[in-house]
Amino acid sequence: RSITEQILQHPGETFDVSPFVDGRCKTPIEEIQAAVDGAISKEQAAKLRQCLNHIDELEIHKAEIEREIFRLSDKYECVLNLVRTVPGFDKNPLTAIQVLSEIGGDMSVFPTAKNLVSWAGCCPRNDQSNHKIKSTRISRAGSYFKPVLVQVANALIKSKKHPEFTTRYRRIKAHRGHKKAIIAICRMILTAIWHILTDLKPYTPEGFLESRPVKKEKVLT
């Protein structure tokens, strides 16, 4: 946007785009520089201004909707605070609200964490006929909910603060690939959410690891 405003304020003038490019931009600066070099007509400038005004209007409407969402979620503040203790849900408050709006705060509708995982579509299918496995793909359930979990999982595996997630991701990725490893992390997230909403206790990595059965060492005789 800053580059567009610079073009509109100084039409026909060449300028260095480097100060206006964010460090996270993947497009090479040389390509951006080549794209903005040149002059624009009055008609093109008018269209650009309309586009910027439209973006500003959308931002206003977005802010109004978010304020209404926060107002409606006030009565669920206690449950939302519990969900925000799960890694990946502490940065954007809307993420926890979106999860709670999908699964609700009452976990009695899901007898076990596996029921919640299956409902969200993060459980692999078992299409088997005559001892022949046809497919183990995850189901199509949770078409709106699953992308949120995947986004959180992708952020978690890049963090060094939560080894309980990154260790499991690397172990599964080594022999099953990135996609299946990410879905496994989604299952971990849902399992953690089910436990904290059932027990009404905040997330702790120690509690999550303790809930997993420890395999006994095999002694060869």
Task: Identify what each model region corresponds to.
Residues 1-221:
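A detector of single, family-specific signature residues
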